[in-house]
């Protein structure tokens, strides 16, 4: 992927945020946001493939709140509502998770782990397996469509689900937080 632009670089109330986009011939949008302070570090990215091939997005969250509380999430997030996507050869989730409803834009393979900072590297091999599977899917299909309406339900659902807007409103103000959510994170909803 190639760096495209920096959408935002903010500082407020002891918190920093950067929001960037990247390009690739097979992706409509690839975006990442990094939010950090002395007390926490949150990284989120979603890759939106070009359309016409029924491919999922790939999403990843790495959230560190303190030394002993880190949450790792990565998944194939299908743009169709009520569509249980599954990738053979990868582990299936063993439980339901708050915020992540399998079959409703989240796959059976959603990977969620709670760990410490020291344990994060233990999950790199699994992340590489997921990312390799995603890369293989995209390279096999070579998506080329640009119909962003395919992501309308997905982004609308994520806008309602994601707690980042409320968190950021307290740090950067409601107007900036709403702009990040609607103009950067989930633009198609």
List PLM regions with ranges:
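Short Lys/Arg-enriched alpha/beta "domain-start" segment
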Residues: 1-68
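Alpha-helical oligomerization segments
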Residues: 140-189
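Hydrophobic, Leu/Ile/Phe/Ala-enriched alpha-helical segments that form helix-helix packing faces
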Residues: 7, 11-14, 127-141, 168, ...
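Extended, non-transmembrane interaction/recognition domains
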Residues: 44-150
């Amino acid at each position: 992927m190639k760096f495209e632009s920096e959408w935002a670089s903010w500082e407020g109330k002891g918190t920093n945020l950067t929001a960037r986009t990247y390009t690739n011939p097979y992706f409509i949008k690839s975006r990442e946001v990094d939010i950090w302070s002395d007390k926490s570090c949150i990284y989120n990215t979603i890759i939106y493939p070009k359309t016409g091939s029924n491919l999922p997005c790939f999403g990843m969250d790495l959230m560190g709140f303190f030394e002993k509380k880190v949450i790792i999430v990565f998944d194939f997030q299908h743009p169709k509502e009520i569509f249980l996507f599954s990738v053979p050869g990868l582990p299936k989730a063993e439980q339901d998770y708050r915020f992540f409803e399998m079959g409703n834009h989240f796959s059976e393979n959603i990977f969620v782990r709670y760990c410490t900072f020291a344990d994060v590297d233990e999950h790199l091999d699994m992340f590489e397996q997921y990312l390799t599977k995603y890369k293989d899917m995209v390279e096999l299909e070579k998506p080329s469509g640009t119909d962003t309406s395919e992501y309308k339900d997905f982004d609308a659902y994520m806008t309602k689900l994601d707690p980042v807007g409320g968190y950021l409103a307290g740090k950067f103000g409601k107007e900036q937080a709403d702009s990040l959510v609607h103009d950067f994170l989930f633009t198609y909803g």
